[in-house]
Amino acid sequence: KGNIDGPRIYSVGDPIFVTKYRTKMYRPITSLKDALEHVQFNKDHGATAVKDYSNHNRAARQHLVEASRQLGINIISESFSNPQMNLTQLVDGFTGLEHTMGLEPIYEDVIQLLNSTALGITPTLIVVYNGPSGETYFHQRERLWEDSKLLNFFRKDELIRLRRPTHYWPDDHYTAQMGITMKKLYDRGV
C-alpha cells in the first residue's frame, strides 16, 4: 500500500539470491524445506515479505511461494526484465513485482491476467528494464553536484564521481513510456 516508512530492507529483509553471482548472499533452494528455512529466517528478523532475486528455476520459485503462504508472508519478485518469468510468477502466486516487466505496450490479455490476481506492482521507474534507466535523465539534465539538497547528504566530489555523462535523445528515454504503461495498469485496478 506504500505506507512503510524507511528503507525496503526493513520490510523484506535479506534478499533470496538463488544464483551464485552474489556468492555471499547465495541461498540455494532445492526443496520446500529449504524455502521454509529461508522464509522463516527473514520472518524471524521482522520481515513482512521476502524478495526473490532473479530466480530462473521455476520449481524453486514455487517452493518459495508455498513457504511464504504457509508462513503468512508476502513474496516479491526482482525479475531482471524477463516478462516471461514475470508471467509465471504471477500465475504461481507472487504477491508483488518490483520495477516493471520491461514490456510496453502491455496488451489486454496481460492486463486482464494481472487484474485477476492480488499482485501489486511497485514500478520503481528510476530503474527501467530494456531501456535507459530513469536515473540517466537526471544525469543528463541536471548538475547534481550543485544541488543544494543533495549537498546536505553528499560531498561535492562524491556527486561528481557518481555522474554518468551520457546523451540520450528525448525519444530514447524509456521511463516516460513505461510510466504511461504503468498508469494504464493502475487505472485498470492492477
For the regions a language model picked out, list residue spans one by one.
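Generic structural signal for hydrophobic
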Residues: 42, 64, 68, 88-90, ...
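Alpha-helix-loop-beta-strand connector modules within alpha/beta enzyme cores
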Residues: 2-15, 61-80, 118-123
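N-terminal small/glycine-rich loop or linker at the start of catalytic domains
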Residues: 7-24, 62, 152-163
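Active-site mouth loops of central-metabolism enzymes
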Residues: 19-36, 76, 81, 168-171
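Active-site environment of divalent metal-dependent phosphoester hydrolases
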Residues: 1, 17-18, 55-60, 80-87, ...
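Glycine-enriched alpha-helix->loop->beta-strand junction motifs that scaffold or abut catalytic
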Residues: 46, 69-73, 90-97, 116-120, ...
